[in-house]
Swiss-Prot record:
It is a multi-pass membrane protein. This is Lipoprotein signal peptidase. It is found in: Cell inner membrane. Signal peptide: none annotated. The active site is at residues 123, 141. It comes from the Bacteria. Pfam families: Peptidase_A8. Coiled coil: none annotated. Belongs to the peptidase A8 family. NCBIfam families: lspA. It catalyses: Release of signal peptides from bacterial membrane prolipoproteins. Hydrolyzes -Xaa-Yaa-Zaa-|-(S,diacylglyceryl)Cys-, in which Xaa is hydrophobic (preferably Leu), and Yaa (Ala or Ser) and Zaa (Gly or Ala) have small, neutral side chains. GO terms for molecular function: aspartic-type endopeptidase activity. Pathway: Protein modification; lipoprotein biosynthesis (signal peptide cleavage).
């Protein structure tokens, strides 16, 4: 088992564990330090604001009556299982894609923990530029976003395997 972890992308589970812990610690701080919808200004454009998200990204289906909690939890568990499978399948040297998978895994699990414990996701990172206010989010959301961006860049810039050259004269291609 140790050899599988060492040689595969499972070696990157440390990153998922650290990000999951950071997500949960910051959410714990939020619910212990702030009342619901209370804000603590850090900069004029950035605050910690305690909010509850009963839906998915941007509160999608947030007012659907409660069934969405189970749907989003099931989706996150399936995606997390698939990401662990991909990590196991990848070589440990595939750094960027393994990093992306680990970040997305940590974000999915961080929000699953909230949904299972509270029935909603705790959000607290609040950016207000005056002319535009971004929906409040959390460390787990940031990890998912960062992992997705890495995957996109990796798809554009990763070295592609060269096709196997067919011997000259072989027309059965």
């Amino acid at each position: 088992m140790a050899e599988i972890i060492e040689k595969s992308g499972l070696r990157w589970l440390w990153l998922a564990a650290i990000m999951l812990a950071l997500d949960q610690v910051t959410k714990y701080w939020t619910i212990q330090s702030l009342d619901l919808y209370e804000s603590y200004e850090i900069f004029s454009f950035f605050s910690f604001t305690y909010a509850r998200n009963y839906g998915a990204a941007f509160s999608f289906l947030g007012d659907a009556g409660g069934w969405q909690r189970y749907l989003f939890t099931a989706i996150a568990i399936v995606v997390s299982s698939y990401l662990v499978y991909l990590l196991k399948k990848n070589a440990s040297t595939d750094r960027w894609i393994n990093c992306a998978y680990a970040l997305i895994l940590s974000g999915a699990l961080g929000n699953v923990v909230d949904r299972m414990m509270f029935g909603y996701v705790i959000d607290f990172l609040d950016f207000d530029l005056g002319f535009y206010r971004w929906p409040t989010f959390n460390i787990a959301d940031s990890a998912i976003f960062t992992g997705a961006v890495i995957m996109i860049f990796e798809s554009f810039f990763a070295k592609q395997a060269k096709p196997i050259k067919q011997p000259k004269g072989n027309k059965n291609v």
